[in-house]
Every structure is written in structure tokens, then in C-alpha cells.
Swiss-Prot record:
Protein task: DNA ligase that catalyzes the formation of phosphodiester linkages between 5'-phosphoryl and 3'-hydroxyl groups in double-stranded DNA using NAD as a coenzyme and as the energy source for the reaction. It is essential for DNA replication and repair of damaged DNA.
Designated name of the protein: DNA ligase
Biological source species: Pseudomonas putida (strain W619)
Catalytic activity: NAD(+) + (deoxyribonucleotide)n-3'-hydroxyl + 5'-phospho-(deoxyribonucleotide)m = (deoxyribonucleotide)n+m + AMP + beta-nicotinamide D-nucleotide
Keywords: DNA damage, DNA repair, DNA replication, Ligase, Magnesium, Manganese, Metal-binding, NAD, Zinc
Covalent S-S links between cysteines: none
Gene3D superfamilies: 5' to 3' exonuclease, C-terminal subdomain, 6.20.10.30, BRCT domain, DNA ligase/mRNA capping enzyme, Helix hairpin bin, Nucleic acid-binding proteins
SMART domains in alphabetical order: BRCT (SM00292), HhH1 (SM00278), LIGANc (SM00532)
Amino acid sequence: MNAESRIHALRAELDQHNYRYYVLDEPSVPDAEYDRLFNELKALEAEHPHLVTPDSPTQRVGGAALAAFSQVRHEVPMLSLGNAFEEADLREFGRRVVDGLDQPGAVDYSCEPKLDGLAVSLLYRDGQLVQGATRGDGTTGEDISANVRTVRNIPLKLQGKGWPAVLEVRGEVFMSKAGFDRLNAAQAEAGGKTFANPRNAAAGSLRQLDSKITASRPLEFCCYGVGQVSASIGESHIGILEQLKAWGLPISRELRHAAGIEECLAYYRDIGERRNSLPYEIDGVVFKVNSLASQRELGFRAREPRWAIAHKFPAMEELTEVLDVEFQVGRTGAVTPVARLKPVKVAGVTVSNATLHNMDEIARLGLRIGDTVIIRRAGDVIPQVMQVVLERRPEDARPVQVPSACPVCGSQVERTQLVKRSKGKETTSEGAVYRCVGRLACGAQLKQAIIHYVSRRAMDIDGLGEKSVEQLVDEGLIGSPADLYKLQFDQIVGLEGFAEVSSKKLLDAIEASKRPSLARFIYALGIPDVGEETAKVLARSLGSLARVQQALPQVLTYLPDIGLEVAYEIHNFFEDEHNCKVIEQLLGCGMQLQDEGELAAEFAASTTLAGMIAKLDIASVGPTGAEKLVAKLDSLDKIIAADGIDLRQALAAKQAEAVREFFKDEANQKLARDIEAQLLAFGMHWNSEKKVAEGLPLAGQTWVLTGTLERMSRDIAKEKLESLGAKVAGSVSGKTHCVVAGPGAGSKLAKASELGVKVLDEDAFVVFLDEQGIAI
């Protein structure tokens, strides 16, 4: 293909990408791919200037305005910035600035993050917001006045005084990471469209024809400059932004001065290191010559100013090809699809694999083997496939098939079933996860189960990393967690990584793990959907392993933050004969669970007959109706036996009929009696009024840990406090009851002193625990 043909092809492709990005809000390629195509066209046109035409993408900023909005002409064009991708590019920009100004000393720059959102213009007349517009093609944008008025941090009227009669403010409308997560969760729950990233969400939300939809979205605005202004408001870029802030307009908290390009590079590196912890997405840093006089002297070239540049971060999104989809087996037997990719650099790292989560995600993406896809990598997050580029799908692309047999052990692979209970009826539906039924006979599940069991937050067996566990399994020395306690010195000494000293240390660590807290033991079992916090809830509320094993799913839902699906996972785990055998083997190895005892006082006192009735999910009967029913009929037997007349004396006719119909079903009668019998057997006592929790000495108190503890880890200290009923928080406030401060305590200790909060050093804390009967 000759230069002229390539130029025509590039223009056509870029025009199509612009249309998809600006008009349809459906980007078809990542920014990095667009930049490569644009720069290739720019270079070809520089080599062949006679081929440059006015309608080339290099001669304008973006795409056409949406026809559904009225158009707005920008009095001062909204130009885009040149890009720097390497440090050398930024230094070259700095050299051009110095040459253009011909002034001694370092040039003063402004530095601010390049937010990943939608550029907008806000026009104020006499301090009142009268118009909002998108950038559009840089000369003509879309009138989105009604929508920008719904963005909460955009002032409808400027504060203070001294603003010019005409003031055009420019900035970025964006969506924070937290706001994006909330929006997508709400969209998914409502069965609506979810967004690929915060930028798409912000653009799609701001360009809604119905401003009520925009108002419901968590949009934010940040100023980065001005357009037309009827009177001077400053002589420097930072000075102007500070003035805008004084008038009530939000500016970046990361705005900084830099003296010379080397300080600009230091800013770029610093914010790059903090990028993933920022509350919003950024794709680079913008540097501008701070002096307006210097800006005027440097002027513009083609589509961009000579006095500003955007230093981009390595692309977080890239295009690549799906070579295959393989399936991995996890600790719970979940068979998870993983995309094998043609290697590509993303965010500075070569990526050849990406998670696909489950088959529902593959269906949502419409993914086939052979497809070209957009992948995204942010920080330490596993690379994800974000979108399929359908225009590039080859004719021989193949659908992804779930294996019928486990790729590791050959056992059958089954789709999980989800249980839901509504209006007294239980229904099951297919889940998104497929599982291998091989359990610990499956090498992959066995290895992952052992790795989880010995991990720091589980049984904390030091000296057993992933490679060591794999070696012990491959050598046939362990076939279940219980086999760890049967290991002998002569079996492990001489294995790779195990000399005499390390072998002895490992056996000592295994022996020391025989006295875990109940919560640690439950967590170590690897129950599906039971994390560390849920394990603590089970241990703290039910008080013994036996009660956790016996608990009905409906009883488990009485515990904080445990829903019916998780409750069934717990119940089914302990109903499984294989799991029961493993637990029996572990207990038979001399395991002594600590902290076992009675049912938690606050749990025992909080459950009432009315609460139980309300949780049966009888149509039309909520907590208030259940209270009325129990006030009239004070036992489950009376409620089940009641006729329509008795029920109507307590409830409205519709509710009374619902109760009667519910208990006509013998299965519902049995369920209610089973729940009541178990609650009473556990130590519940019906009381129509909810009691205040008693029995735990620190119930209702908030404690804070700070500094380094020498006699125990902070995780252990947290466990001890939680076992006494305390809530352990991460910051000090007026509601904090006590702070435990070890060596190196800093701002939290200072805050406690300022607020007059009680402080214990580690020695005093150990004495306190001893007084409560808690061993160290």
C-alpha cells in the first residue's frame, strides 16, 4: 500500500473510531490504539504535506455533535493537547519551551492530573450558570445545560464577588471509582446496561436526553482552565484556578507548581505511584507553562498549544487476540475460564492471560476463541477482558465450551444451583459457577485447600508456602489437611527446601497450630463464600463448632450479614459426608479449639418469636405484622392452629389469609417447628421485646490498635478484642472507648490524647486481657 492509500485508510478508520466514541458512546478501540493510528497519520502527512486536507482528523479535535442536542459554537476553540509518552518526549517539550521563550532560569509549570472523563464548558453571565456544552469537535459542541445543572459540585451561582460579566470555565466531568462501582451494581440489580469503565459511565450519563437520569448518576466536575473571559482574572494558570476555587468552583487537590522539567518528571513519578489509591481514574498528567504572558508568547500550532502537554501513563487498555480459553480449578472446585492471549504490553507489563470469571461473563461479552478483545490492567488487579471488537472477528472464531470432565482429575463438572426462598416457597436456579465434584481427590482442589488451610489468616503454619505444599501433595505425603498432622521428620527432611533445621521448625509450627481460635478454624476449612469476617460472625454468635455444624440455613440467616445463599453454602458444606470426615480427622489429631462456649448473649437475646415469624417470608407479613400476630397468639403452636377468626383479630384480612395459607402447607409447618426447636435448643428464649445484649464485657465499645505490638500481632489483638464484644476500628474519633498503642504509634495516639480517649500500652493491654480470662 502506497502512502496516499494508507493515509486515506487511516483517515477512514479514525473517522469511524471518532463516530463510535463521540456519537455512539461506544468506543471500539483503547486510547493507546487510537493514538498509534493518529500518530502514524500525522507522520505520513508530515512526510507528504501535499496530501493534507482540511477534513483530515489531524486538522480537527474530535467528532460531530449528537443531533439530538442543539449545537453550541465555542467562541474560543476547545483544543486538545499534544501527548508525551516517554520521559524523552517531555524533555523535548521542555527544550522547545525554553527555546521559544529565550529566558534565563527554570520555566515555572503547573502540574495536575489528567482526569479520565468528558471535557465540558460552563458559561457564567453575571455569576449565573447559563450554559453547559461538550467539547464536540473543538469548535462546535452540544448544549447540555440542563444536565450540567444536575452535577452537584457545579455551582449554579458563583460565590464571593469580583467575577467578570462573562466567564467561561472549562473542566472535566468524571465519575469516581466508588461512584462507578455503585452505579454498575445498581444497573446490574435492575437488569440494565453496565458500563465498561468510569469514563464511559460519565460520558453516557452526561449526554442523556432526560436530565433526570443524569441527576441520578454520581457525576463530579473539576476545573482545569477558562475560555472566553470579559476581563482579566489573573496572570498565571495556577492563579486563575485559585481564583475559580474562591468563587466556588472545584479544582484538583493535586495541583502543584514545578520549576523546570525535572520537577515535572518528579511530579509525574509521584502521582504515578499513587495512581491506584486516588479516588478517580486518571490517564496521565497535564503540564502547562504557568505564566499567561509566556503562554501568549509561545502561542499555538495546528490543533494544540505550544505551552501545554499531556504526559500519558502507560496504557491500561490494549488490543490483543484470544488464542484459547483454558479452565482452572480452584479451592472450592470452581472451574474458572482463563483467556490465553497473544502477549501484549499493558501498563508497562507483558500480559498473556486474563480472567473471564465464569461462563455468564463469557456470554455477556459474546466472546469466542480467535476474537480481538480490549483488555484492561490497573495496578495489581488481574488483567480483565473488557470488550470484544466484533468488527475484527475472524470467520473461524470458535465458541467457548465448558468441559464436561475436570481438566485436572477427570471428575464430572456440574453447574451450581442457587436456592431462593420467597413467600414460603423455595426455588432453585442455575448459578454462574461450574464445579468439579472430585473434592480432595482432585489434585488442584487439594493443593489450593491446603494452601488456604495453612495461610497466615487461617491456621498460620509458617514454613509452608505454595511450592512446599505442591511438593508434599505431589510426593503423596498429604491427601487432606489432617495429613499435615501425621507428617514425620524423616518424610520431609531432604525434600527441596527442607534441611534438618527447617524440617524441625515446620513440624513445630504444625504442632503449634493445634490450638486455633474457633473463627480461624472455621475460616481454614475453606467453606465457599465464607471469608474471615463471616467466620468470625459464626464463631462469635454460635459459640461452638457443633452449633455451626448443626445450624439450619434459616437459623444462619439470623446472624449479621449472612444471607440465604451463603447460609445454604454453609449448611451444605457441613451436610457433606466427605467434609464431615475431614473435620472428624482434624479433631482426632488433637485439635483444641479455643474460645468455644455458650451462644453469644447478644444473639440469644435478640431473637424473638415475632422475628422468627417475620423471617418465614409469609406474603404481606413483615416485622410489624409479626409483632401484632405474636401479641395476640403468643406461641408457634397457637399460630399454626389458629383459624381465620383468630388471625383476623390480630391482622388485616389479607395478612390473616396469607398466614392461614402458609401454615396449611405441612412442609411450612415442619420448617417453622424445626427452626423454633433449634433456636430453643441453642439457648434462645422467646421474648416479645428485644433485650439489650449482655454478657460480653466490651459490647458496644469501639477500640483502636496503633503502633507495633511485640507480644502478639495486631490481627491476634483484634481477635481478642472482638471475642470480648468490641468493635475494632481503623481511626480514632470521639466515639472511641480505648486506644492500644505500641511502639511507633503516631497520629492515632496524638488524636487520642487530643480527644481525651483512654490509652493502654501493650503491657497494660496484656494485663487487661488476663483480667478478662483471655490467654496470650
